[in-house]
């Protein structure tokens, strides 16, 4: 997010300084992202945002505008399959996709198996703990699915962040790594800059919080956290990269899969691997973190076994590996799993946070959102009173930025990483 914002603002003539505690662009949560580009969200604004952002990923080099000597991230088109199960029938999704011109198919269980024979299309709902005696029960019905052919993933999310940062630098942006913000300076009701743990101070009339899992801490330093109606905090997650079974590799045209029936998502990856995570089913405990600098970034046997055994139910030929292959990472999760792209009660202090593990795909638009929020405040427009809109280039339809306000009522969403 920070690199996207830096590019948009520097490209529009602003002097931009990026402070990052990490060692490189995208070295934090971005590097652990599954980097999925999909349109399966819960409401008008979030689906429209994802569809508009996808157009930039499809033409990534054109969007970035500057060739990165380290290489350019690439979009891998796989399509996206969502099994239709309890609590998700896809009807609202299809209505909105029809409005935006997003193509899709509804596939019967037989059609799913014909296209991808690796699947078991049986229904296991609800998702269960592996300690539950019913976990091994046979499926009791069959699942149809919703498939869109235009989704996919970026092959290297950290490289994508590097591409954005490199382009921002070409427009004059400066990046400082291994630097930690320890304070937000103010004069009255206006931000004046930041102080660093090293003792340095940086003066700035505009400060944007895009600190990922550290963002709640920064909002507290600014004194704006308590006035927010929607809050956010770090959530620990694990994502695994086991070998893919024969029949479900990139060469087999395997899709990205949202399996809410078992509480997981997975996709094919390069090197005959899978990328597997969870959709936070009710049977799984959530591990919120108090301090984003003090947590276990190693995968755990408990999490690994749970995810692998569920995956084997959907892909019967999947061989559960003996070695723990994966990473621990942090989401910055809001109360409703919808992000915060907003101003604050402190003039000049803005936030692009609460990305909830599902916003990598929208990074190309976030810089544009923040630019118009800043410009509106400079023009005396109160976004809290008169919510701004962003008109998408692809559809000509308006995204209501009030949907991402810190003062919104909690949105009705999937209540998990699906958003």
Predicted ranges, named:
Residues 1-2:
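Hydrophobic/small residue at the entry helix of a nucleotide-binding pocket
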Residues 146-166, 212-214, 261, 299-310, ...:
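Mid-domain beta-loop-alpha active-site segment that forms a flexible
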Residues 7-11, 15, 35-37, 59, ...:
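Active-site substrate-recognition segment that forms the wall
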Residues 12, 106, 345-419:
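C-terminal lid/capping helical subdomain adjacent to the catalytic/cofactor pocket in oxidative enzymes
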Residues 86-171, 176-177, 183-190:
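Flavin (FAD/FMN) cofactor-binding and adjacent substrate-gating region
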Residues 119-138, 317-365:
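FAD-binding beta-loop-beta segment adjacent to the flavin cofactor pocket
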Residues 35-132, 263-264:
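Dinucleotide-binding Rossmann-like beta1-alpha1 core, especially the glycine-rich loop
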Residues 10-30:
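Glycine-rich FAD pyrophosphate-binding loop
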């Amino acid at each position: 997010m920070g690199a996207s914002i830096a590019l948009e603002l520097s490209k529009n003539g602003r002097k931009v300084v990026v402070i990052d505690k990490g060692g490189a662009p995208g070295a934090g949560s971005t590097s652990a992202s599954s980097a999925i580009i999909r349109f399966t969200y819960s409401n008008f604004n979030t689906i429209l945002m994802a569809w508009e952002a996808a157009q930039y990923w499809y033409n990534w080099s054109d969007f970035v505008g500057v060739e990165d000597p380290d290489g350019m991230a690439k979009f891998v088109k796989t399509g996206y399959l969502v099994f239709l199960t309890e609590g998700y029938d896809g009807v609202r999704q299809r209505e909105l996709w029809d409005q935006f011109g997003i193509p899709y198919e509804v596939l019967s269980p037989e059609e799913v198996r014909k296209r991808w024979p690796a699947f078991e299309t049986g229904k296991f709902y609800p998702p269960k703990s592996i300690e539950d005696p019913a976990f091994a029960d046979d499926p009791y019905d069959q699942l149809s699915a919703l498939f869109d052919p235009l989704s996919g993933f970026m092959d290297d999310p950290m490289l994508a962040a590097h591409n954005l940062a490199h382009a921002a630098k070409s427009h004059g942006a400066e990046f400082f790594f291994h630097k930690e913000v320890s304070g937000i300076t103010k004069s009255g009701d206006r931000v004046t800059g930041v102080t660093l743990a090293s003792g340095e101070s940086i003066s700035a009339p505009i400060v944007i919080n895009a600190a990922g899992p550290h963002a709640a801490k920064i909002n507290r330093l600014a004194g704006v956290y308590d006035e927010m109606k929607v809050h956010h905090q770090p959530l620990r997650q694990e994502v695994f990269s086991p070998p893919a079974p024969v029949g479900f590799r990139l060469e087999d045209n395997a899709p990205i899969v949202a399996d809410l029936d078992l509480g997981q998502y997975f996709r094919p990856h390069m090197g005959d691997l899978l990328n597997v995570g969870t959709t936070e089913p009710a049977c799984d405990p959530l591990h919120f973190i108090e301090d984003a600098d003090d947590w276990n970034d190693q995968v755990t046997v408990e999490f690994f076994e749970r995810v692998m055994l569920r995956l084997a139910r959907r892909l019967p030929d999947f061989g559960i590996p003996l070695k723990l292959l994966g990473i621990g990472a942090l989401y910055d999760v809001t109360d409703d799993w919808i992000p915060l792209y907003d101003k604050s009660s402190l003039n000049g202090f803005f936030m692009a946070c609460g990305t909830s593990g599902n916003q990598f795909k929208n990074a190309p638009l976030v810089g544009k959102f923040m630019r118009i929020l800043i410009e509106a405040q400079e023009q005396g427009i109160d976004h809290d009173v008169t919510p701004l809109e962003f008109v998408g280039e692809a559809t000509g339809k308006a995204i209501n930025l009030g949907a991402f306000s810190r003062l919104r009522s909690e949105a009705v969403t999937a209540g998990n990483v699906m958003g």
